[in-house]
Amino acid sequence: MEKQLASLLALLPQAEVIGSADKVITDVTADSRAVVAGSLFICLKGATVDGHKFLAMAAEKGAVAALVEDVPAAVPQGVTLIKVADTREAMELVTPYFYDYPGRKLRMIGVTGTNGKTTSTNIIRLILRKAGYKVGLIGTINIMINDEITESHNTTPDVVDLQKTLYAMCCAGCDYCVMEVSSHALALKRVAGIEYDCAVLTNITQDHLDFHKTMENYRDAKSLLFEHLTDGNKPNKNAVFNMDDPSSAIIRERTKANVLTYGEGHDNDIYPLSFTVEPKHMQLLLQTPVGEMDLELKITGEFNVYNVMGVIGAMLAEKIDKNIICSVLDGFDGVPGRFQLVEAGQPYTVIVDYAHTPDGLENVLKTARSITRGKLWVVFGCGGDRDNKKRPLMGALALELADNIVVTSDNPRTEDPELIIDEIFTALQNVPEGKHVTRLSDRREAICYALAEAAADDVILIAGKGHENYQILKDRTIHFDDKEVVMEYWSDKKC
């Protein structure tokens, strides 16, 4: 892939160009470590790092042009500077163009919401593949291009990485891209240049208030996906809404796309006629626009009833055959770290789940309670450098819904883990008789404590990290996997 620099400059008519425009651009990057010969280097000003400081390094590695907001005293030899008011906005224009707008060539399905995105997108991918399409997926756990899998670092990558990934999907012959679309990505315009065909809203509950500040701002960020759904030239855009979530009624009024709805009410396009939740599976009978769907699912939990309905809405919007949808749903056995049962030969049930929001924790605790014959344990913490308002809320939910609560660390990041736990404990002061609260900041120790103390018929929910295989502690990241800790404990009864 290459473009003439002059053609990129046509997108930035207000830019001041210092140097020759007669150059060929072979790559676009905002990471100085990724610069190659012929790169356009984008100098971004971040919260802690200013990309302008790496301009000289980028020049040494072969950058031939750079987007800047500030012109340095000494312009690197051979580098054309393109001075703009906002390099981030310029990046949003230039990058999709450089990669020939891959998000307009693929059929794009975006799933947004606080919870349920990963499960929903993974099921959609499998259904589309069963229907004969080549499919890419971008999500929290990984990025998939047909059968090629790479680890993901953000729910939605930055603009450059995202466009590069979509371009790779086009090169691999993909028909579809299924994406988890985060509120950060929408607010920061990471999805610039992408034209979605179908968008699904799972739910909106408290999360990311460290970034959005208010729930209204958070909802409005999610709403952008639907407000701009009909932008562009693709026909027949579809929006799928969970009408049991209050935000859906508001956002629905902001889209001009075709609308499909799901929820408990029989006035929805998709609604449950009956469902039975069992410890390891559930039966679900749904009414849909193409008739009843009778499902025997290998996943469980009322929250998954909603995920399944949202998936069906998207797939019916894409005209996928009902029988294909049902066959994939019946065979789907979940994704790592989403209400994942851990079997290590123990006499009780252990569940690992990514729940890290009040709503997510409430949902999985209620499902865990429904399958608990003994005591319900929960081991959880809250992430550092993130929304601290949810910490007491999660503590209160744990106390309400579990019998034995073990409060520990999640990813404390730069915060003191003990102070995070202190904030959770503001909701754990008045412990009812018969319930027990334990505080162990070492996550391995906390998990092992629950594993050692639980009795037959108990259920242990280890919440917060799910699929993650790391823990972020101040200035270092260590290997840590909740499931591995359980397996190791039961292999030699020690941690």
Label each residue range with its predicted role.
Residues 64-70, 239-243, 379-380, 403-411:
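Short internal beta-strands
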Residues 40, 65, 198, 238, ...:
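Well-ordered beta-strand positions
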Residues 1-93, 97, 268-276, 296, ...:
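N-terminal leader/targeting and accessory segments in enzymes
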Residues 68-71, 181, 203, 409, ...:
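Short secondary-structure boundary segments
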Residues 89-243, 247-255, 309, 371-372, ...:
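Phosphate-binding loop of NTP-binding sites
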Residues 18-28, 91-94, 157-160, 179-185, ...:
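Short gly/ser/thr-rich secondary-structure transition/capping motifs
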Residues 72-78, 198-349, 426-433, 437:
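Acidic, Mg2+-coordinating active-site environments of NTP-dependent enzymes
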Residues 1-16, 37-40, 290, 310-337, ...:
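ATP-dependent carboxylate-amine ligase
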